[in-house]
Design a protein with these regions (language model features):
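Sec/Tat signal peptide C-region and signal peptidase I cleavage site
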Residues: 19-23
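N-terminal accessory beta-strand-rich subdomains and adjacent acidic, glycine-rich linkers
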Residues: 25-234
Length: 234
């Protein structure tokens, strides 16, 4: 089957506690950020991101995918089969944009896992830049591998506080809304006023918002959550 990739990027990130012994940590190229990966005792994959001084931006958060066939879900009961660290550094010239050249420099952690019950493999690839983190899920190919239908993604971004959010309502049809500015805890109460439903729009959650989502902490740290490279993804 084709390699299924799902990148989620967050600019300026972090997390904490409850880790099993199978923990991996990598630092960004200049050492300012640290990415921590671990399995819980139940075999649930988790990650957290912090500054080098230990200050958290994103707390310990779960990872995983729920499949339509629950027995094939990668949500728990996983074990690490291999890990690989690498570094990449290149500079490329965009065809159009605000800058002439862009440096693509990151340290990478590839975590290969398998389901204990049936041996099905999955990999999670992390790329840690000096200004943010990206990660994606990968399904190793091969004629003997099963096909999967993803029902729900379980990736979490556990914030450290009730940050200020700059958001618009989330739906699958349009982005034609006025931006709202509120605390995360206030989104539910403001959602109905911010959302205007018509024949081309339908909300999926009273707290669902569009990406990219820009957040600002009380300490002045900006966090941007976005997604890209949605290949063979529902």
């Amino acid at each position: 089957m084709k390699l299924a990739k799902h990148w989620i990027a967050a600019g300026a990130l972090l997390l904490a506690s409850g880790w099993s012994a199978l923990a991996q940590t990598i630092s960004s190229p200049k050492g300012g950020l640290q990415l921590h990966f671990a399995l819980t005792n139940e075999g649930v994959p988790t990650y957290r991101l912090s500054f080098a001084n230990g200050e958290e931006i994103i707390r310990q958060s779960r990872l995983g995918l729920e499949m339509t066939d629950g027995k094939k879900s990668f949500d728990k009961d996983l074990e690490v089969t291999a890990t690989k660290e690498s570094t990449f550094d290149e500079t490329w010239t965009p065809v159009w944009g605000e800058v002439k050249q862009i440096r693509n420099h990151y340290n990478e952690l590839l975590v290969e896992l398998k389901k204990k019950s049936n041996g099905d493999p999955i990999a999670i690839r992390f790329r840690l830049f000096d200004d943010g983190l990206g990660f994606r899920y990968e399904f190793p190919g091969g004629k003997d591998r099963n096909f999967y239908v993803v029902k729900r993604e379980l990736s979490e971004f556990a914030m450290t506080g009730d940050h200020k959010a700059h958001w618009i309502p989330g739906d699958y049809d349009t982005e034609e809304y006025d931006y709202q500015h509120s605390r995360l805890s206030e989104i539910r109460g403001l959602f109905d006023k911010a959302f205007t439903e018509n024949c081309s729009q339908k909300a999926f959650s009273k707290t669902g918002v569009q990406t990219p989502l820009m957040l600002k902490t009380d300490k002045g740290v900006y966090i941007n959550l976005h997604e890209a490279a949605l290949i063979d993804f529902p």
